[in-house]
Amino acid sequence: MYILGLSAMGHDSAAALLGDSGIVAAMEESKLARTRASEGIPREAIRYCLERAGIRWRDVVYVAIASRPWRAWQRQASFRARLAPLAPVSSGYFVNKASGELGRELNNVRIVRQMAGAPEGRVESLDHHLCHAASAFYASAFERALVVSLDEKGDGRAGFVGIGEGTGLREVQSLTLPHSLAWVYSQVTKLLGFRPHADEHKTQWLSICGEGGGDADSGAAAVKGAAAGAPSVAAGAPAFTELFLEMLRREPRGPAHLNAKYFRSGFAGELSFTHEFYRRAGIAQEPAENTPETRVPEPLRVRIATGLQRACEIILCEWLTALREEFKERSLCLAGGLYLNPLLVAAIEARVGFENVFVQPAAGNEGTALGAAYYLWHRQCGRARIAAMPGPYWGPAYSNEEIKKVLDNCKAAYHWCDSDEGKLGEAVRLLQAGKIMAWFQGAAEFGPRALGARSLLASPWAPYVKENLNDYVKHRESFRPFALAIPEERCGEYFECSPNGRFLTTMAKANGAGRRLLEGLPPGFLLHGNLVRLHVVHAADNPLFWKLLNRAGENAPAPLLVNTSFNLFGEPLVVTPRDAVRSYFCSGADALVAGNFLLEKR
């Protein structure tokens, strides 16, 4: 039996296929269509899933769509009705806009029904947050857990709290708009000059720059002054933490309750800030024709980002602690775009007190495709619980013959390695020489992170490794840290890391030996509080990458490699051999190992 799950209504569309053996295939549309944050029906991802299973539409018993358009419209309409007295001019615009979105989404459901050939392949629409929650609980190894989903406004609400037990998943709390931490995080991201719904990770890493910086005493004084009517709290990050805590007033039934003193509804229905926020933050009122970067000076950007991150950690940790005490659960499952924040996940693991925490690696909207399929599999079909998610490698894989056809077509010069050992030896030679190596092996990752199948690798001991990666390959902001990869068996020698390090969804902490090791590396790998971005590689998940790490560590202080995503700036992760060749030749990478083929630039 096969069930196809789809994220087909908002950004980050994707498809996932479940069969009797478990997950068969899963892939984001953006990686196959080569566009960022693809929306709508994931036609290429659907085609891939069916091809990987060797089936046709008629073999799919159910199609599960991770959205309920009518229910989302009703929630949005109710939300806007409550806001109408505050923004009467925009209410009519919103009704037209929401009605247009509803029409498009209902049309997408109709098209999927036609593609599936219903009634042979039945199509079910499921709640967005329910699918997030299902993607986390059913992929975990827990028999019972508290399950929490938080994102911006999926299907017209901010979040979901449920209890998962066996094959069951029931809702115990619904979080309503506009009280959405993720929504606020996106709007602050926009304020800082980044793209909302795309660059929230930049806000997160910018916040690290403010940790340990600034003067806590002057920040506290600024808060006291602001309470007395002073014009600004811009003296330091602690002051902004207090400001955001005031803006995101905590209340018992949710992680936040937005203070209307600081928020307003824009003409198009988006969340925006009031004049009072700009006054308290010490920045100019938002002009109609300007960019945030010209408005917010760099020191303020860091303090705002740091204050927001700290406030979110405080609010969520206190709320999740209250939920743990209320429901008496020992395990926690998390999904939703807000949990793509490893700093936040690490804070939850350290402070909340759950014995076990699992974060769905594809925590964004793409993961709802998997959750929709999981939910129908267990609840609609009554099938037994599928084993815990065995890894993220559910995308396309390519044979050496397929790779060779592309290389020959591109007239690329290459060297053939006749065994895995030979390939590993060549790769280690390149890494020890300080080269940046593109690594294209096996099935592509499902989810936003490169986990050793579509990666750019380098030795962390190579001179100027961060500068070379940033300037010649990634072309990204210098404040963003790179991840390190280490074999699971060696991790405990240097780091403390939860099982979520397997998917790069949390932060590790360097112990004494780890601090001494990383202090010998260029700045930026060891972060404030001894935190490290760490990919813990299990031999069962990715045996070839695990072997490479161990081989690379034979003549190095430790089996560590820098691991970052293999893609050009502004593009999704590479998937196909042609993607890999194009990205390799258009970047400053020194070498490409694709299958058993080695390409080097001279």
Please provide the spans of the model-predicted regions:
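Conserved residues at the C-terminal ends of beta-strands
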Residues: V63-A66, A335, Q360, G595
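N-terminal phosphate-binding loop and adjacent alpha-helix
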Residues: K31-I55
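Short HxH-centered metal-ligating active-site micro-motif
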Residues: E44-A53, V63-S67, L548, A556
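Phosphate/ATP-binding catalytic cores across multiple sugar-kinase/actin-like superfamilies
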Residues: T306-L332
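Flexible beta->alpha loop and helix N-cap segments adjacent to enzyme active/binding sites
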Residues: Y2, A8-E28, A33-R36, L86-P88, ...
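Phosphate/pyrophosphate-binding loops at sites that engage ATP/ADP/AMP, CoA/4′-phosphopantetheine
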Residues: R47-V61, A116, L320-K328
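Short acidic-aromatic active-site loops that bind/stabilize oxyanions
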Residues: A98-L102, V123-L126, T294, E298-I314, ...
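Short beta-strand-loop/turn "lid" adjacent to the catalytic site in phosphate-handling enzymes
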Residues: R56-V109, A134-S135
